[in-house]
Curated annotation (Swiss-Prot):
It is found in: Cytoplasm. GO terms for molecular function: ATP binding; tRNA(Ile)-lysidine synthase activity. It catalyses: cytidine(34) in tRNA(Ile2) + L-lysine + ATP = lysidine(34) in tRNA(Ile2) + AMP + diphosphate + H(+). One of its GO terms (biological process) is tRNA modification. The N-terminal region contains the highly conserved SGGXDS motif, predicted to be a P-loop motif involved in ATP binding. Ligates lysine onto the cytidine present at position 34 of the AUA codon-specific tRNA(Ile) that contains the anticodon CAU, in an ATP-dependent manner. Cytidine is converted to lysidine, thus changing the amino acid specificity of the tRNA from methionine to isoleucine. This is tRNA(Ile)-lysidine synthase. The gene is tilS. ATP binds at S33, G34, G35, P36, D37, S38.
């Protein structure tokens, strides 16, 4: 008897690899929008999970941003039940405005996924991000001047969130969804030039492919993997250094900092700023560099203004971040 078509076999293998270390009897939830990536993920999980002794459930989130979104969420929930998923949750969310429409929708979606996973005590939540999504994320963060940790982009595992398709190209995943008999929904936001990611996908990446040659998507995703390894090593070094120069959660010894490489200093300075209450999304590299100048270019200068009504200052040989 012949096996499944290659794209279907590939996505099943990717899901099997992601789930194989989970304890038997664990519940895994598939986040499904009804698009081709998440439908392929749902189909592969429906096949793989029971063969690994796992329970499969699903969750679909209605952001309420488009006409007909409620009916579409109902359709996706019914499809997941037909695949044998149990439980299946259909969650409606209210999308705010903080950080722009894409970021606000993402925040609302992840909050819903987290709550659903908590309620059902899920061991893992599966997300359908592909290698192409990874490449787009790298470009978006590169344009913001991000560091190694941010450029490392998405991990195959972040806490309970698993991304089985992160090493699989989008075309293969879409072929798998079609071969499984799904009729995916096409999100108009994915082709709307008002959204930055859409412009990267349909304008920037094709230009890079034409100018630099094929393989740019794979190269960007590979860069993310390499940078993740580097960032992990630097974070571990920073952990060790903090034990030596830390003076509580929001202060560091200035002389000890001065003897460390800049990559380690800036990590530690960012940590104390966050611990003091600076909002992560508002704390930029320039803020951290200004704190670093209190170490490397100390001339008795004044404090550094930071987001969240916080200040960084040098006092009694320490770099301290506190409220105004």
């Amino acid at each position: 008897m012949s096996g499944p078509p290659p794209p279907v076999a590939l996505v099943r293998t990717a899901v099997r690899r992601a789930l194989r270390d989970l304890p038997a009897g664990s519940l895994v939830l598939v986040a499904c929008s009804g698009g081709p990536d998440s439908l392929a993920l749902a189909g592969a999980t429906a096949f793989v999970a029971p063969r690994l002794g796992l329970r499969a459930g699903g969750v679909t989130v209605d952001h309420g941003l488009q006409e007909g979104s409620a009916e579409r969420a109902d359709t996706v929930a019914a499809l997941l039940r037909n695949l044998g998923f149990d439980p299946v949750e259909r969650v409606s969310v209210t999308v705010g405005t903080a950080g722009g429409p894409e970021a606000a929708a993402r925040s609302a979606r992840y909050a819903a996924l987290e709550k659903t996973a908590d309620v059902h005590q899920a061991a893992a939540v599966l997300l359908g991000h592909t290698r192409d999504d990874q490449a787009e994320t790298v470009l978006l963060r590169l344009a913001r001047g991000s560091g190694a940790r941010s450029l490392a982009a998405m991990a195959t595992r972040t806490g309970r969130y698993l991304r089985p398709f992160l090493d699989v190209d989008r075309r293969t995943v879409h072929e798998a969804a079609s071969l499984m008999g799904f009729e995916p929904w096409s999100d108009p936001h994915n082709t709307d030039p008002a959204y930055t990611r859409s412009r990267v996908r349909h304008e920037a990446l094709p230009v890079l492919e034409r100018v630099l040659g094929p393989g740019i998507t794979e190269a960007l995703a590979r860069t993310a993997t390499l940078l993740r390894d580097d960032a992990d090593a630097l974070d571990a070094w920073a952990d060790q250094a903090q034990q030596q120069v830390g003076r509580g959660p929001t202060a560091l010894d200035a002389a000890g900092l001065a003897g460390l490489p800049r990559a380690i200093r800036t990590r530690l300075l960012r940590r104390i700023a966050l611990a003091a209450g600076c909002p992560a999304g508002a704390l930029t590299a320039e803020h951290v560099f200004a704190l670093d100048r209190l170490v490397t270019e100390w001339r008795g200068q004044s404090h550094v203004d930071l987001p969240g009504a916080r200040r960084g200052r040098r006092h009694d040989g320490q770099i301290i971040v506190s409220a105004d």
